[in-house]
Amino acid sequence: MSTLNHVRAPAGDIPSLHWQGGQVDCCVCAHAALRALPGAAGCEPGHACVQDAYARRIDRFFRWHPELGNAHLEHPYFEVRAIAARHADVFRLPAMIDDPDETVRLQLALRLPQAHLVRLADDPHREVRIRVAQRLAPATLATLRTDPDYGVREWVARRLPAALLPLMASDPDWVVRVRVAERIDMPALLRLAGDGEAEVRRVAAARLPASLLVQLIDDPDWRVRWEVACRADPRVLRTLLDDADAEVRAMARERLWPSRPVSSPDDTARPFEGAGHG
């Protein structure tokens, strides 16, 4: 038939296969009539096809025909259901919350209204719960602060109302405590200055009132003392002129005497070397 679309799949692309295996047969497709339509008004096996096993081709089909999303929410192939859920009417999505495939539920977590999104807070798959933590209303977010996955809790710490952050200041994972330290208010921030993880203390040092930095001048990690040198008042800076680390000494000198020329090789600050330094 001369009116059929020609396949535009690039050379060397993944071969077109039916999602159940075997070749794609347009004659048995419910959307066979689309083959006679031009360009994005139609469909193309190997390029934009709802029968294909390749998710990219399914996605292209629904981008060409988003109005067909509702009709495929119960399709037996999970990739079709997941991609159809991106385009379906939102009010149709709550019925899919118990879908057996996490790929589908992940798409739901990106689109569900808040009233239904909370139902995915106990999803068995971490990626779904992470998306929930990224979108859940702050007033409801606290339900995820004790999630077993640190990635979920990290997003909670990024978005939880500041007044509730002290509840996460003792999180067992230091990455979560870093996020808490980036946002928590005094006096709870002061407690994190004594955290067992250096990166948490460093973030706390970058935010503490300058008058309280004196308690960190003997911190065992040079990065924490360097943050102190960046912000402390002159009285504290003078004590850091004899610090064991050249980076810290150089920063203290630079802040005490910003126009003073470098007088010795030891006065030259090395480039910031990160967590592996010394």
Over which residues does each language-model region extend?
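Alpha-solenoid HEAT/Armadillo-like helical repeat scaffolds in large eukaryotic proteins
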Residues: 68-76, 94-103, 111, 118-124, ...
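N-terminal alpha-helical scaffold/docking segments in eukaryotic complex subunits
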Residues: 1-94, 98, 102, 226-278
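Repeat-mediated protein-protein interaction surfaces in helical alpha-solenoids
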Residues: 64-68, 138, 162
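Structured C-terminal portions of repeat-based eukaryotic scaffold domains
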Residues: 209-210, 220-222, 233, 265
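Long, contiguous interaction/recruitment modules in multidomain scaffold/adaptor proteins
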Residues: 19-22, 26-29, 123-124, 129, ...
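Structural detector for internal amphipathic alpha-helices that build alpha-solenoid repeat scaffolds
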Residues: 41-61, 78-90, 95, 103-114, ...
